[in-house]
Design a protein with these regions (language model features):
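GHKL-family ATPase ATP-binding module
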Residues: 1-216
Length: 216
């Protein structure tokens, strides 16, 4: 497509901006091959190709490439249904959380109901696991969501048939039914993963408990 000069103030395309967006789309659509070429300057030709068979796992690995990881491979969970959900998670030794959310490949930088469902689900799963395995004792308080998300890098991608966007920039998902769908999916799929991978669960919970103690 070509931009309409009667609408846009500038018609100059920025290669780096387009490159970043196409890389993002390739991460979100496993196996999709995208090529971008800049042929405007014969002396400075640019070309990038993107194809990620790992999908969201590759996205998280890209985001964490310069960070020290607590567990070697991202945790990947997915479920089809009314609202298909894909999530990849990996913990690092960092103190901040980095969660990226997408709806139909649109970057919802303000979050929304899919992010809320994820936060509720992951808080429940890790607290339930810690209680069941006596990592949290009866006298201990539950871990807060912020403790559980410290050091987390996550990418959440959902497909919604009729998305409702809110916020000043329309980058916040407002569909109320998505909260429960994502929360239930996280509980249903992540809980068995932790049971089957106790070393990963233990490493993550050590990080969460350390964050909780530091906060107190």
């Amino acid at each position: 497509f070509l931009a309409d000069g009667t609408i846009f103030e500038t018609l100059e395309y920025d290669f780096a901006t387009l490159e970043e967006r196409f890389r993002e789309i390739a991460f979100l659509n496993k196996g999709l091959h995208i090529t971008i070429e800049d042929q405007r300057d014969d002396e400075n030709l640019k070309k990038s190709e993107f194809c990620f068979e790992g999908g969201l796992n590759s996205f998280v690995e890209f985001l964490n490439q310069n960070k020290e990881k607590i567990h070697p491979a991202p945790i990947y969970i997915e479920k089809d249904g009314e609202v298909p959900v894909e999530i990849a998670i990996q913990y690092t030794t960092a103190y901040s959380e980095n969660i990226y959310t997408f709806v139909n490949n649109i970057n919802t930088i303000e979050g929304g109901t899919h992010l809320e469902g994820f936060k509720r689900g992951i808080t429940k799963v890790f607290n339930d696991y810690a209680r069941a395995h006596n990592i949290l004792k009866e006298k201990d308080s539950n871990l807060l969501g912020e403790d559980i998300r410290e050091g987390m890098t996550a990418v959440i991608s959902v497909k919604v048939k009729e998305p409702q966007f809110e916020g000043q920039t329309k980058t916040k998902l407002g569909n109320s039914n998505v909260t429960g769908i994502v929360q239930a999916m996280v509980v249903e799929v992540l809980a068995p993963f932790l049971e089957e991978n106790p070393s990963v669960a233990k490493a993550i919970l050590e990080k969460c408990i350390s964050a909780s103690r530091a906060r107190e």
